[in-house]
């Protein structure tokens, strides 16, 4: 594939739609010169969510380990030291969150599309997102608040982490 034709997958999550941020989010990608190739609004089922987030067999282990590390970095005790047990809880919360309303699925194309989109989106942990990123500018949630409430973090958007993942 030609470098200028690199594609990436982006999904605006239910909270982004609920807050009417669709146009703002799309504009951010257009302003850097990316081309919108496909767009579709769908309502995800819990099964769709599980398929989407767990295609990589390492995802469950890595997610659990990152979650445990996040607790420890904050001086908190994780609810479990078993990464797979932690991920099961994360996935259950994610299924509820992602199937609570419609999502917008998009494919964007352009040079270095994956890296550019990841920079524009910001860190998955909203409090770590830089000002100027989508999450840094519009998300008021945090891992700590979502953990306290027993729910998934509301971070507006999903973006593929690699060309392989985007495919």
Q: What residue ranges belong to the model's regions?
A:
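Non-catalytic terminal and connector segments of soluble metabolic enzymes
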Residues: 1-167
